[in-house]
A protein has these predicted regions:
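Structured inter-helical modules in multipass membrane proteins
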Residues: 42, 50-54, 58-61
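Long, hydrophobic alpha-helical segments that serve as membrane-spanning/inserting helices
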Residues: 1-44, 62-165
Length: 165
C-alpha cells in the first residue's frame, strides 16, 4: 500500500498492465477448473470479468485521484472516502480468507457494511452536487469508489455461490 502523503503520482502503469494481462490469461483456466470442481463455467466467467473490471476501475481511480492538485488534496482529506477504502481492503482480505478456508460466512457480513459505505458516498455526492462545487475528478473518484463497492458485492456473491457448490 502507498502512503497518502505521496507528493507525486506513483508510476504504476506497468504494474496495472501486468495485473490486467494476468487477469485475461486466467480465462484459459476456466474450462479445466469448471470440469475439475463441477462449478458452472458461468460463475468462473463472472469472477474473471469482475476481476478485470476491478483492475480497470483501479486505474481510473488512480487517474481521478491524481488529476489535479486541488482535487487531490480534497480527496486526501475526505475521511469518508478513506474509511470506505479501508473497508474495501478488509473486504478483499475477508474474500481471500473465505476462499482459503472454504467458508462463505465472513463474506455475508461484508455485504451490509458495503451497502452502508455506498449510501454514505451517495450522500457525500448529493451534498456536493447541491452546492455545484464538485470538480469532475472528485465526482468521478467518488463514483468509481461506489462502483468498486458494487463490484465487490457481486464478487462476494459469486464466491459464495462457488463455495456452496
Amino acid at each position: 500500500a502507498f502512503s497518502p502523503n505521496l507528493l507525486e503520482r506513483p508510476r504504476l502503469e506497468s504494474h496495472l498492465q501486468k495485473l490486467l494481462t494476468d487477469a485475461v490469461k486466467m480465462r484459459g483456466l476456466i474450462a479445466p477448473a469448471s470440469k475439475e470442481t463441477r462449478i458452472p463455467k458461468s460463475i468462473y466467467e463472472g469472477i474473471q470479468t469482475i476481476n478485470r473490471n476491478l483492475v480497470c476501475m483501479l486505474e481510473l481511480q488512480i487517474n481521478a485521484y491524481w488529476a489535479t492538485r486541488p482535487s487531490h488534496f480534497v480527496l486526501l482529506n475526505a475521511q469518508k472516502l478513506r474509511d470506505t477504502q479501508r473497508m474495501m481492503q478488509q473486504i478483499l482480505l475477508s474474500l481471500v480468507h473465505a476462499l482459503y478456508e472454504g467458508n462463505p460466512q465472513p463474506v455475508f457480513a461484508n455485504t451490509e457494511k458495503l451497502n452502508d459505505a455506498v449510501e454514505e458516498l451517495r450522500q457525500l455526492l448529493n451534498n456536493h452536487h447541491d452546492l455545484k462545487v464538485v470538480e469532475t475528478p472528485i465526482y468521478g473518484y467518488v463514483w468509481l469508489n461506489m462502483e468498486t463497492a458494487h463490484q465487490l458485492e457481486l464478487l462476494s456473491n459469486l464466491i459464495c455461490r462457488a463455495l456452496r457448490k
